[in-house]
């Protein structure tokens, strides 16, 4: 009996220490953790992608504008080869009528997609499950898997980084106290880049990238998601048309649509000098404009809004009000070019972070 109790105590301590020492990206982890705070079967739309998505689209403001519930299941630098795992994880708790997929994650090279840091941002932020194990096994060679199964092997030396441990626990505590993540998945920088560089490294699609897109679209077709919309968020430099055509041809085989919103600046009323904080990310002004445009598009094309309980509707109204207040403060700070980073778990009564 004493041995059993001792084993249990050791197991609890092991799990607690493993949890405390994990350090990937605080922002990315909170974007993912916030998803699990949403009531089951309460999301009409789930959006997948990387930082462009949660910098440029606000789920609470979309609810206020178009009446459907949604969540950015995203983290910075999310590679397209993980989108299947992200959708699989989503469908455990939600049955969205529509999945929206931002395509930037498909443009990473095969080497970049398989980087340990990108994989760990995802698998170290989700609960232990068959999906987590399968994702590790699909992306890591057998000889290298053990530190992914027992992540204390990776993070054991982090006990010295007390400042980051404290910031991470504070962020988790903030979201937990809110009940749900009030701004859902969100990040911005309070600036407007009036001198955006004219050139960024060109986006290219190779055979590997097309295969990843095709595999994901095929997986979507076999899933329980009713429909999928592939999009490209507005960027300051457009894709070459041949890559738009390659994406369209790939996803249309499965009955899905692709829309490149780089081509809708006039309709959205976006200006590069006012609505972006860097060439690839909208600021809060651009976020508000694009959220209204995309949510109208989704409402008109897919009509995803479902029936929800009065309690859930009340909470979404609270989220929209909280987000409006936060955006008002962020817009003022953006006009002043404060240049700080903010997240859904930030204390908006104080200045944001100097770095991401």
Indicate where each model-derived feature is located:
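Residue-level recognition of beta-strand->loop/alpha-helix junctions
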Residues: 74, 232, 260-262
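Secreted/periplasmic serine-hydrolase-like ester/acetyl group-modifying domain
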Residues: 116-226, 309-356
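Alpha-helical transmembrane signal-anchor/signal-peptide segments
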Residues: 24-43
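Acidic-and-aromatic substrate-binding clefts and catalytic sites of carbohydrate-active enzymes
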Residues: 77-81, 205-209, 234-242
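Membrane-embedded segments
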Residues: 48, 52-138
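Loop/turn elements at helix/coil->beta-strand transitions in domains of secreted/extracellular proteins
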Residues: 42-44, 67-69, 95-98, 221-228, ...
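Hydrophobic membrane-insertion alpha-helices, especially the h-region
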Residues: 2-23
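C-terminal regions of proteins
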Residues: 243-348
